[in-house]
A protein has these predicted regions:
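A broad helix-preferring feature
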Residues: 7-15, 59-67, 115
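A contiguous active-site-proximal alpha/beta segment in oxidoreductase catalytic domains
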Residues: 97-140
Length: 140
């Protein structure tokens, strides 16, 4: 998987070290804003990526097959939609969209395009999942 990362904020800085050892995953490129070009370039060098850009279209035009979107929430829907329309798999930070209509539209579009669409959320530490985990041994 060739991953393109959108965003240069704290969450991206926390995710990149975790992604590095994942077999079969290559962090190919990163896209920031004009204001964060220097930071994108620094992250590119630090994590041996091929590409650092401030133009989202250039990232989508590259060799990536999957996009990880970690930008301000109000941008999630439009950026995810553009990636799906370009045939890219999408992992988008929570909340995936601002409302149910947008979520339904994105899901339908991803299905039509034959790509995966994920919201980046870990549930295993939530109390309801912890409760289920504790109860599993008692029910066999």
């Amino acid at each position: 998987m060739k991953l393109g990362i959108v965003g240069t904020g704290t969450i991206v800085e926390e995710v990149l070290p975790v992604l590095q050892p994942v077999k079969g995953l290559s962090c190919y490129g990163i896209c920031g804003t004009k204001r964060s070009e220097a930071k994108a370039e620094k992250l590119k060098e630090q994590y041996q990526m091929q590409l650092a850009v401030s133009d989202y279209e250039k990232l989508l035009d590259s060799e990536i097959d999957t996009v990880y979107i970690a930008v301000p929430n109000l941008l999630h829907f439009e950026m995810a939609k553009e990636a799906v329309l370009r045939g890219k798999h999408v992992i988008v930070e929570k909340p995936m969209t601002a409302n149910e209509r947008q979520a339904e539209e994105l899901c339908a579009l991803a299905k039509k395009q034959g790509v995966f669409l994920f919201e980046a959320i870990t549930t295993r530490y939530q109390s309801n999942y912890q409760f289920i985990k504790e109860q599993l041994p008692t029910i066999g």
